[in-house]
Amino acid sequence: MAVKVLVVDDSGFFRRRVSEILSADSNIQVVGTATNGKEAIDQALALKPDVITMDYEMPMMDGITAVRHIMQRCPTPVLMFSSLTHEGARVTLDALDAGAVDFLPKNFEDISRNPEKVKQLLCEKVHSISRSNRRFSSYSAPAPQPASAPAPAPSSFASSRSPAPAPAPARAAAPAASANSPAPKRKAYKLVAIGTSTGGPVALQRVLTQLPANFPAPIVLIQHMPAAFTKAFAERLDKLCRISVKEAEDGDILRPGLALLAPGGKQMMVDGRGAVKILPGDERLNYKPCVDITFGSAAKSYSDKVLAVVLTGMGADGREGARLLKQGGSAVWAQDEASCVIYGMPMAIVKANLADAVYSLDDIGRHLVEACL
């Protein structure tokens, strides 16, 4: 069955070109278009599309406001179009936090020339996020909290640094995959490495806000994201978390209580001296940054002292790096299917029998504390 798509943009040219590109795929059907956020809400309710492509700047109602309304009234996977600027990064992160699943740079020059790469990427993203639909509503909703639990983490990125909530106590009924996983083994890890893609910005926020300021292990983060976005993303996480978060620079020293985010468009490696190396992005690799590259360097530098975590994302990036980590005796965790936006990267870990444990997203931060403190 074809994926039904609603295209939302105030530019007639962009609506037409996006519709043409998507309609050229026999497995995608453009069921409608809208010129502003208000129309998008009405069309989403009437047409019940599988995926919505959404611009940000529009008259009457902007894209982020529309996404919030759609998530409340008819939760639907949204693919945001954004500009590759610092402001575009801020807006895109706001949209992801409001409930959008993924994003694509909005480049009129590229889309007007209709290059094959743009067509392929757009269609791949639509197909990928359409598969998140069956569990999308439950993922978008705040995680349930016991009556005695501390206040939950804010649903949006904080505008200023504030104390993060204490890790929530274990719930009585966890997803089956989590319930069957062993309790984490306490160990003096020298590094925690977390890799993710689609759905990662929100997932990383949920995990990192549960870590205390005195978290004893250095952390490296690999999120598939363009170069213009990673600095803004690191700054946002830093304002929300009790640990410090920054975009990694060449020569940065790994230290407890600090998370270094791999810069977009480049590769990040760690060395045995406790520093990171930032290398140019290799055009032969699909991902810049690439989880496999960072995991592989960690396996070489830290042997059995790494705790790797693979979160939501499409594809299989991280699997080969995790294999090297396992060969060296390190531990690998995967996010469970029920809490993933896209169960791709974690599934690759599980299917390759590389996962020491499979945990629900809301439990991973707590388990990191248990394993490392």
Curated annotation (Swiss-Prot):
Family indicated by similarity: Belongs to the CheB family.
Single GO MF annotation: protein-glutamine glutaminase activity
PROSITE patterns cross-referenced by the UniProt entry: CHEB (PS50122), RESPONSE_REGULATORY (PS50110)
Main location: cytoplasm
Annotated ranges, domain CheB-type methylesterase: 182-370
Residues spanning the membrane: none
Catalysed reactions listed for this entry: [protein]-L-glutamate 5-O-methyl ester + H2O = L-glutamyl-[protein] + methanol + H(+); L-glutaminyl-[protein] + H2O = L-glutamyl-[protein] + NH4(+)
Catalytic residues (UniProt): S197, H224, D317
Species this chain originates from: Pseudomonas fluorescens (strain ATCC BAA-477 / NRRL B-23932 / Pf-5)
Keywords: Chemotaxis, Cytoplasm, Hydrolase, Phosphoprotein
Protein name per Swiss-Prot or TrEMBL: Protein-glutamate methylesterase/protein-glutamine glutaminase 2
Domain Response regulatory: 4-121
Gene3D superfamilies found in the cross-reference section: 3.40.50.2300, Methylesterase CheB, C-terminal domain
Compartment annotation: Cytoplasm
Composition skew (Pro residues), residue ranges: 143-153
